[in-house]
Structures are given as structure tokens and as C-alpha cells.
From Swiss-Prot:
Chain's gene name: trpD
UniProt keyword list: Amino-acid biosynthesis, Aromatic amino acid biosynthesis, Glycosyltransferase, Magnesium, Metal-binding, Transferase, Tryptophan biosynthesis
Family statement: Belongs to the anthranilate phosphoribosyltransferase family.
GO annotation, cellular component aspect: cytosol
Positions bound to anthranilate 2: R165
Catalytic activity field: N-(5-phospho-beta-D-ribosyl)anthranilate + diphosphate = 5-phospho-alpha-D-ribose 1-diphosphate + anthranilate
Lineage: Bacteria, Pseudomonadati, Pseudomonadota, Gammaproteobacteria, Vibrionales
Metabolic or biological pathway, per its Swiss-Prot or TrEMBL entry: Amino-acid biosynthesis; L-tryptophan biosynthesis; L-tryptophan from chorismate: step 2/5
UniProt name for this protein: Anthranilate phosphoribosyltransferase
Amino acid sequence: MQTIINKLYEQQGLTQAESQQLFDQIIRGEMDPVLMAAVLTALKIKGETPDEIAGAAKALLANANPFPRPDYDFADIVGTGGDGSNTINISTTAAFVAAACGVKVAKHGNRGVSSKSGSSDLLSSFGINLAMSAQDSRQALDDLGVAFLFAPQYHGGVRHAMPVRQTMKTRTIFNILGPLINPARPNIELMGVYSKDLVRPIAQTMLQMGLKRAAVVHGSGLDEVAIHGETQVAEIRQGELIEYTLTPEDFGVSRYPLDAIRGGEPEENRAIITQILTGNGTAAQMAAVAVNVALLLRLFGQEDLKANTQQAIAVMKSGQAYGLVQQLAQRG
């Protein structure tokens, strides 16, 4: 272990196996907090590589509580948070809309990072049980096409790093690990990142983790596909990394200012999301959700973004997506 730590002090990159070994020790609570702070700082200053991120993610997944993984294709749609924009919960809303469009989504989330209301804050306000067992969540995924996995329930070991992270008061590798450690291990993922510099490295990390098809996006300051500007995309398709830029016009929607999709406290967000999921949101709110659903549907093989956007809007207007929220809440 000392050899691994010395490599970091010398600003050398770790192999995936070394990173996995290092984070295994952190997650098991076997590393002194002072040393942990030094390690996280050294990684941050050096800049985390895809090997290091993949190794850390594998360590967290290996130590996570198990989830009965389905053998069908299913996805996660998630952002790192931390983009400081306080927008409405786009990825959480998109998960229900995508499920209503006929694909399966197992969303892994936590309490708010950059918005006042993270995915789990919002779901709680709808009466959805965050403490649902793994078996019940799997059943919901089978029956409804959507399930929510609350991170602390599966990743107890992360608590060992919490005091250090809170004291450091800066972003560390843990801020980007959340979306990579879904315990259901989806084979498709749409992930938003808070910085355009992360788009390629995170996509390379996903390639190493064996995802079938995935896209990493940064939308003009947002950890989502943007409707106020361009979105940088790195997509994994058949083991290849393809990079491109998308504009709102590619989805057939107008451009809207960022202010048009600001969120609020969980209760305010609940009202906004209810409006969107019943087809009564503003044009900007509906478009913001629809473009993210559209790119997710592309990852399931529906290549036409404009048609996908229209499908998502039609599903919102039909009320089907809101019906799934209610059905998930009824499962207690």
C-alpha cells in the first residue's frame, strides 16, 4: 500500500488494480483519515485518470450491498451534480418519461449536491420509499420499467470518507464516482458531468467498465443535455468512443434561457415536476426533459433524436409518466 501512496506523492498515475486496492481500503474504513486526505488531495492535484476512476468505482461496486441484476437492457440517467446551476431535477424526471416511452431505467441517486433538491429529496416528496429493498426495487423495474436505488442503502462504506470530504470542502474523486457505481450495474448510461474537461475521461472510464452503450454529456455549464446552448457528447458505441456536439435544433426544439429551467426547494420542485409529467409544464421545462430522454432513447437504438423528442413530449402530455410516479409511490 505504501508503494501505491508513494506513487501518488510523486504525481504518478496508478493502474486500475492499484486504485482498486487503495479505494478498497478506504471503503472498508481501514485508512487513517489524515492519510486519506493526503491521498484524495494528491489525486485531485494530479488529475484523476480513467484507470484510477475505474479502479475506485470497481472497489465501491465490489463492496456494495448486492442487487439482483436483470438480464435485459436497462439504463441509468444521472448527473454528477455540482454544476451550481440549481435547475429542476431533469434526470429524475427524464427517468420516468423514458420508462413511459418503453425502456427500463434503474436510477441511482442521492440527496442534493448542486440543486436544493437532489433526486432523492424530490422522490421523497412524492411519497416514494427510498428504503425499498433490492428485491422490491428489482420488481418495480420489471413491472413499471423504473426503479430508484438510494445510494446510502447500498454503499455504506462511503461513510468512512465522509468526515474527510466534509473537512476538505473541495471536490474529490468521490464527486464523480456516484454515477459510476449504480449497484444494479446497468449496461446503458447517460451521464452528465459538471465540467467539459470530464466528458472524455469519464467516457474512457465507462469503456473500461464494460458498458454496452453510453454517453457522457456537458451542456454549456450543465450536467445535462442543454436547451440554452451546445452540448458536448462522448458516446460509447460498439466499443468505440465517438465525440460530437449537439444543439437544441438537433432535437427540433427552440433555445431557451437557463433561467427558464431553474428549480427550487423540494416542495416547489414537486409542483413543477408534476406539471411537467402531466404535460402542463412550460415549453422550456418540457423541452429540457424531452431532449435528455431523446438522447437516452438513442442509446437504446432509437437513433432519430427529433422523433424521440416528440415521443417524450407526447408521453408527458398523456400523463403516463406521472402515472408511473404514483405507482412507484404506492409500492411503499
